[in-house]
Amino acid sequence: MKYAILLLFFAASVAFAATPTFPLVEVPSAHGTSDTLVVFISGDGGWAAIDREISNVLASDGMPVVGLNALQYFWKKRTPEAASGDLATIIDRYLGGWHKSRVLLVGYSRGADVLPAMVSRLPADAQAKVRMLVLLSPSQKVEFEFHVADWMHNSSAGMPVKPEVDKLGSQRILCLSGQDDHDSLCGELTGRPNVEIVTLKGAHHFDGGYGKLGQIIIEHLK
């Protein structure tokens, strides 16, 4: 019996050690009324004001948020396949841990750029749980690695994002951009029945007013 207990303890320890760790931020909800988990991938500024304020609005509406700090995560080069696998792990872990059945995926800037490729590579059972993708200020191209120079200017390198959106079929998408953000992907997605496009004042950072973005997401989710 003693050896059986030791064996179980050892197995649990190995499983815990093998559990991947990610730069995550948890924003629990005080109201457990929603069946939806939010996974939010930030931009290159890390977990910044826009991510915090939108997450607080979503959590106050009953949807707990787990945020992936893209600055830290993409400091190391990733592949779309590996990033998708990590997203699947996060979704599975938090759906079970927070007792939710569906997921809302939100990305800002680089977070929005990587989401289509990550979602298109998810297992079918995980894709079936996705209520909607929210792309905030998505660009035309994306690299799955952060470079310090990206803080200075937009890079024209990387894989095109639009073909990855095409792979998502009828998946519901909400695309938000500033009217002065001329590099935004949103304009390339007009006319698609599964894509809702919202254009707001400002440019890539929407000129602040981040709480309003959270409310727009909630309105379109209904």
Regions found by a protein language model. Give the residues of each.
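Short, surface-exposed "cap/lid" segments of acyl-processing enzymes
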Residues: 30-63, 69-70
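Alpha/beta-hydrolase active-site loop
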Residues: 77-98, 116-117
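Gly/Ala-rich beta-loop-alpha elbow adjacent to hydrolase catalytic centers
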Residues: 106-115
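Conserved hydrolase catalytic core segment
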Residues: 118-130
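The feature captures the conserved acid-bearing segment of alpha/beta-hydrolase catalytic domains
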Residues: 28, 143-193
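A short loop-to-beta-strand scaffold at the N-terminal edge of the catalytic core in hydrolase folds
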Residues: 19-28, 36-37
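C-terminal catalytic histidine-bearing segment of alpha/beta-hydrolase fold enzymes
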Residues: 195-222
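Active-site nucleophile loop of the alpha/beta-hydrolase fold
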Residues: 132-144
